[in-house]
Amino acid sequence: MLYNGNKGPIIKKHAADELGLTRTSITRASEQLKKMGLISEKKSGKESEMITVETGYTLYELAKDHLINPVQKTICVSVKPHKESFIAGESALSKQSMLGTPKIDIFALFKNSNAVQSLTEIDEQWDEGLFAKIELWKYDPKLFANNGMVDLISLAMSLSDNEDERVQGELQELLEKYKW
């Protein structure tokens, strides 16, 4: 809904189809969003529409305390990332801001992806063959990814615990400049 911009109401059925969720899941989610004061609903014929109370950055600011960090676990690997992975973390931020590129590239991969089974985790302290860090995500980053990178909102949530002032400053600037 944050990426919907000013395009108007979202039909629940369409949201469920687009996100690969059941109508029951969307109904539960919309009930939670209503309780948080982020949306209202109205009936349009047989369809139920969700309408956000705000749009763009203002909606993000209202919602961010309710959003989750998508990263369940980060592992280090010595192989090139799988084609199902997306540039994430400081690597993604560095490509969109003035932040320097991290020494080790960071990618996101859905934790339930078949590609995860083929990865061999290594200890970055002992293995010099480190190629990348893989963030295993709670949901598929492909849902919102753009141009081979994770989406901005998921990126912001994944970096929310990062205490580096440079990272937070660049992230804030990126969020404010983003064309919602």
Language-model region placement:
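Short gly/pro-enriched beta-turn/loop segments at secondary-structure junctions
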Residues: 10, 45-46
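Short acidic, hydrophobic short linear motifs in intrinsically disordered regions
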Residues: 6-19
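Short amphipathic alpha-helical interaction segments
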Residues: 20-35
